[in-house]
């Protein structure tokens, strides 16, 4: 689940199945629009890439599903970059702050993405491909034709097999390694697929459309709203308590207090919970995290969760990104509360 004061992501352990791409699928790949910002490479063109196999990967640095594909992309880049494969990462932002190039480049460095990147903040490449998904992969042959595509996670072996097929077409003498094994157990055939709470957006625009916020006060875009938690929580809905500014993309804390009395709460069923959050004022802020009314057990702690000397669990929000809050040892329904005593959590 993705929860943030921007949104909450309850991340499932699931894998997408390969789309049914016909064997004879063949569509000319569009040229990259002019005027794009390229990083980690000189500007590339489809015309100039003729003879290569090109994997165009649409990603977003706060997207958990994109992040889960990175180990496979890095493996393919390492194995096939000298055998004719060129990966082009197209970063198209979901949130306004993800348009900032510095944020994108820091994320690319942190994730170890070593291939050419396009900063697609105006959705130019996205529209050219008619794309609708993060992540999305389009595989292009030596003659510049899209021969395969996949949306979402999963189908890693099938995608790698298609890469090898097109590399063989480009160079029949090329020697290729075996298809890689699943990197995570949840990517293996037969892995359990749990019914998880869906992704939740807390901003007034998408949250209002989806009916995410369950408080009687509802959304009041542009205003600071004093919310009261009704106390009876339903699965998959968000409950706010305290003073929160309503914006299109986020709920933002506006009250500084001695104790963390303002909070966002949900009842969820998930193995993993992530949240996209940013420090609105550019300074680190602390968010306290409670699981079923108590600090998170260390066995269930996510990668970004910390503990103080009293065993209380918290996050330090020091940059706009996705924070991994919980990795539950056992799948179950739980309540999660994110509380703050500081200004500018959103």
Predicted segments — roles?
Residues 2-38, 157-346:
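Non-globular targeting/processing and membrane-anchoring segments
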Residues 37, 102-140, 275:
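Short, internal strand/loop/helix patches
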Residues 67-110, 121-125, 287:
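Structural microenvironment flanking redox-active thiols in thiol-disulfide oxidoreductases
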Residues 131-170:
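Non-catalytic, surface beta->alpha helical segment in thiol-disulfide oxidoreductase systems
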Residues 43-67, 73, 86-88:
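Short active-site neighborhood of thiol/selenol oxidoreductases, capturing the structured segment around
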Residues 31-54, 77-80:
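A short beta-strand-turn-helix
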Residues 50-54, 82-86, 112-116, 142:
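Loop/turn elements at helix/coil->beta-strand transitions in domains of secreted/extracellular proteins
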């Amino acid at each position: 689940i993705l929860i943030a004061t921007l949104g909450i992501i309850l991340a499932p352990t699931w894998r997408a199945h390969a789309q049914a791409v016909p064997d004879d699928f063949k569509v000319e790949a569009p040229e990259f629009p002019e005027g794009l910002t390229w990083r980690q490479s000189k500007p590339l063109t489809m015309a100039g890439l003729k003879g290569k196999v090109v994997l165009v990967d649409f990603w977003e640095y706060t997207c958990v599903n994109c992040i889960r594909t990175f180990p496979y992309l890095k493996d393919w880049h390492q194995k096939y970059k000298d055998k004719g494969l060129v990966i082009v990462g197209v970063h198209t932002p979901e949130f306004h702050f993800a348009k900032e190039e510095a944020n994108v480049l820091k994320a690319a460095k942190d994730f170890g993405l070593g291939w050419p990147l396009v900063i697609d903040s105006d959705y130019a490449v996205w529209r050219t491909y008619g794309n609708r998904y993060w992540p999305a992969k389009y595989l292009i042959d030596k003659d510049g034709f899209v021969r395969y595509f996949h949306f979402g996670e999963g189908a890693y072996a099938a995608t790698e097999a298609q890469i090898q097929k097109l590399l063989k077409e480009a160079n029949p003498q090329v020697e290729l390694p075996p298809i890689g094994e699943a990197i995570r157990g949840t990517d293996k055939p037969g892995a359990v697929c749990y019914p998880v709470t869906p992704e939740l957006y807390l901003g007034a625009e998408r949250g209002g459309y989806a009916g995410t916020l369950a408080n009687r006060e509802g959304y009041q875009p542009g205003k600071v709203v004093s919310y009261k938690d009704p106390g009876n929580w339903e699965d998959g809905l968000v409950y706010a308590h305290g003073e929160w500014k309503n914006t299109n993309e986020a709920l933002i804390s506006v009250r500084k207090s001695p104790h963390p009395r303002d909070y966002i709460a949900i009842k969820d069923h998930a193995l993993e919970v992530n949240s996209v959050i940013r420090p609105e004022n550019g300074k680190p802020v602390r968010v306290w995290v409670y699981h079923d009314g108590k600090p998170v057990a260390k066995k269930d702690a996510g990668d970004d969760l910390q503990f103080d000397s009293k065993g209380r669990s918290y996050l330090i929000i020091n940059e706009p990104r996705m924070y991994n809050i919980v990795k539950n040892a056992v799948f179950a329904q739980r309540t999660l509360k994110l509380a703050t005593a500081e200004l500018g959590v959103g």
